[in-house]
Amino acid sequence: MKFSEQWLRQWVNPPCDTAELAHLLTMAGLEVEAIEPVAGEFANVVVGQVQSIEPHPDADKLRVCQVSVGQQESLQIVCGAPNVTEGMKVPVALVGARLPGGLKIKKTKLRGVASSGMLCSASELGLAESSEGLMALPVDALVGEDLRGFLQLDDDSIELGLTPNRGDCLCIAGIAREVGVLTRCEVQVPIVDQVAIDSQRSLPITIKAAADCPRYVGRVIEGVDLAVDTPLWMQEALRRSGLRSLGPAVDVTNYVLLELGQPMHAFDLGKLQGG
């Protein structure tokens, strides 16, 4: 079981640091096998917004971007990412920034055009093993804000080696209950607003293996837009738990499993036949 320490502390926040928390869990039989930071070491990276894009005069695959980073003047940054668009918000490594692997960003010229900074992908920041193009940030990200603060990257992923008798701790809720008992801290169960489902459609279900599955519950949900991106905060919670984003429907079910321990699966209603 791998999880974000910040996620756990949303449920229960004992007055101890990461090392003390890991010791408490291990002594309680929930052996901590690994603790690792959720992102690579980097500094001086902020939220930027691409204001304009022009073709590079001497390189077909490069483009010259004017980028706002919350200062009086925008920065000119040469970029080769295929997905850069006007208006998008992206991580910007300022001149003097240090990225994972020891790369230091300097003011330079690319094919004769000055470039003052670097637009970053998720992999260049240690947030993904690989990535295609720039990391797109949410539209509500504040231009100029430090990226580590915006993404709350001062966090650790904790991995537990659970024994078969502790299946109750295969989720944040179960681990939080255990930590609450160990530290005598109150567990704060998140308040979730009830969502009204208006669909009147249903699908008959037949349980053919009642001994193994005595009860099955499903619900038809219509009007789901699978073209939208999963919210970045949910993508980050999944990533810090060892899962990658696979689209909003799968991500929501995986998130519920990790937080509450309730297995779920989303089916395409149009492809279901029978019951």
Residue spans of the language-model regions?
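Phosphate-backbone binding interfaces of nucleic-acid-interacting proteins
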Residues: 1-199
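Glycine/proline-enriched, intrinsically flexible loops and inter-domain linkers
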Residues: 5, 23, 28, 63, ...
